[in-house]
């Protein structure tokens, strides 16, 4: 597993101006068994809110993780903050206390509402937490993290997958074992308020025939 002592697993590198990429890896427990802790929507806005999250919830997760045998990872399924981007720095500092790598998912409240457009609104998130779309292996299985928040501006967003995300999944799947269990980790559930998501049918068509579990919050 990539080094995660910064609060976010360092499995990625910024490519601009570089032609060599070195990664510090840590050996995981042997065997194919694993555990996943999935949490969502801490939605902390004030320092007092965050102190509550960093108290009993983090302590409980650390206790649970300490009882695991074998590999273990955590997923935080979006809305780490409530429209306060500096909370992400506080989160990174505290989540390492759980004792396992925690992988983030972007939520609608992790965007900057004052900016216009999906990429601009999530730029600060990317700088602190890494890419919005990525995948990693655990045991023989694979976790696929997707951004299904298409942000506009001023708290307005569309739920679904951009064409770019769909193309990324399409290119990823041939690289994955067909017998692997896939966990799709995303912020909004598939059936959002009784409505389908933008490009939902395209995603499900790509995943057809696979063993898939969706993990979400919102």
Language model features with spans:
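N-terminal active-site segment of His-dependent metallophosphoesterases
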Residues: 4-8, 12-89
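Extended active-site neighborhood of metal-dependent phosphoesterases/phosphodiesterases
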Residues: 11, 85-170, 176, 199-211
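Active-site-proximal beta-strand elements of phosphoester/diester hydrolases
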Residues: 33-44, 140-150, 183-187
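Active-site glycine-centered loops adjacent to acidic/histidine catalytic or metal-binding residues
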Residues: 41, 78-79, 107-108, 187, ...
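Surface-exposed cleft-lining segments at the edges of enzyme active sites
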Residues: 44-46, 79-80, 150-160, 191-192
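Long, structured stretches of catalytic cores involved in phosphate-ester chemistry, encompassing
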Residues: 179-185, 189-218
């Amino acid at each position: 597993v990539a080094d995660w002592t910064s609060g976010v697993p360092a499995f990625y590198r910024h490519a601009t101006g570089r032609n060599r990429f070195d990664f510090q890896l840590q050996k995981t427990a042997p065997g194919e068994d694993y555990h996943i802790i999935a949490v969502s929507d801490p939605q902390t806005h004030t320092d007092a809110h965050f102190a509550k999250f960093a108290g009993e919830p983090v302590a409980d997760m650390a206790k649970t993780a300490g009882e695991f045998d074998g590999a273990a990872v955590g997923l935080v399924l979006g809305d780490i903050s409530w429209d306060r981007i500096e909370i992400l720095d506080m989160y990174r500092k505290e989540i390492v206390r759980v004792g396992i790598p925690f992988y983030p998912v972007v939520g609608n409240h992790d965007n900057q509402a004052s900016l216009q457009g999906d990429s601009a609104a999530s730029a600060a998130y990317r700088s602190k937490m890494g890419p919005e779309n990525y995948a990693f292996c655990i045991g023989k299985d694979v976790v696929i993290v997707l951004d299904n928040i298409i942000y506009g501006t001023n708290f307005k967003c569309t739920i679904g997958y951009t064409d770019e995300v769909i193309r990324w999944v399409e290119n990823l799947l041939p690289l994955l074992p067909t017998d692997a269990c896939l966990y799709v980790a995303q912020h909004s559930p598939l059936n959002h308020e009784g409505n389908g998501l933008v490009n939902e049918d395209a995603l499900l068509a790509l995943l057809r025939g696979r063993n898939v579990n969706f993990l979400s919050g919102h």
